Swiss-Prot record:
Keyword Mitochondrion tagged: no
Organism this protein belongs to: Synechocystis sp. (strain ATCC 27184 / PCC 6803 / Kazusa)
Keyword vocabulary terms for this entry: Ribonucleoprotein, Ribosomal protein
Family: Belongs to the chloroplast-specific ribosomal protein cS23 family.
GO cellular component, one term: ribonucleoprotein complex
Record Pfam families: PSRP-3_Ycf65 (PF04839)
Name of the protein in its database record: Probable small ribosomal subunit protein cS23
Function per UniProt: Probably a ribosomal protein or a ribosome-associated protein.
A biological process from GO: translation
Coiled coil ranges: none
Subunit composition and interactions: Part of the 30S ribosomal subunit.
Length: 112
């Protein structure tokens, strides 16, 4: 799914982007501007660091972002990180395409 397609399926001003990797998952947020997007944050890597907390801090520092939008993005990030971590804990691998199918409102890229 392209960023524009994801943006059109969920009417929001922001979109969660995920790098789906074997040893890490990375999360970032883009702002939807017109028919395109603009990077809002850098990528934060889990479990290398507390990506969720870093994302939360970054979004809270941008006071112009509505609380509802912050909560929505952080809830999506929580679901993706938990899903990835649960798979790692079970020694399972899932393809990026399968992850994209589970989270159609999130834009995925990665190595598998």
């Amino acid at each position: 799914m392209t960023t524009a397609e994801a943006a059109s399926t969920v009417h929001t001003s922001f979109i969660l982007k995920v790098l789906w990797l074997d040893q890490n998952v990375a999360i970032a947020v883009d702002q939807i501007v017109g028919k395109g997007t603009s990077p809002l944050t850098s990528y934060f890597f889990w479990p290398r660091a507390d990506a969720w907390q870093q994302l939360k801090d970054e979004l809270e520092a941008k006071h112009w972002i509505a609380e509802a939008d912050r909560i929505n993005v952080l809830n999506q990030a929580t679901e993706v990180i938990n899903f990835w971590q649960d798979l790692k804990n079970q020694n399972k691998q899932i393809s990026m395409a399968e992850a994209q199918g589970k989270f159609p409102e999130v834009v995925f890229s990665g190595s598998n």
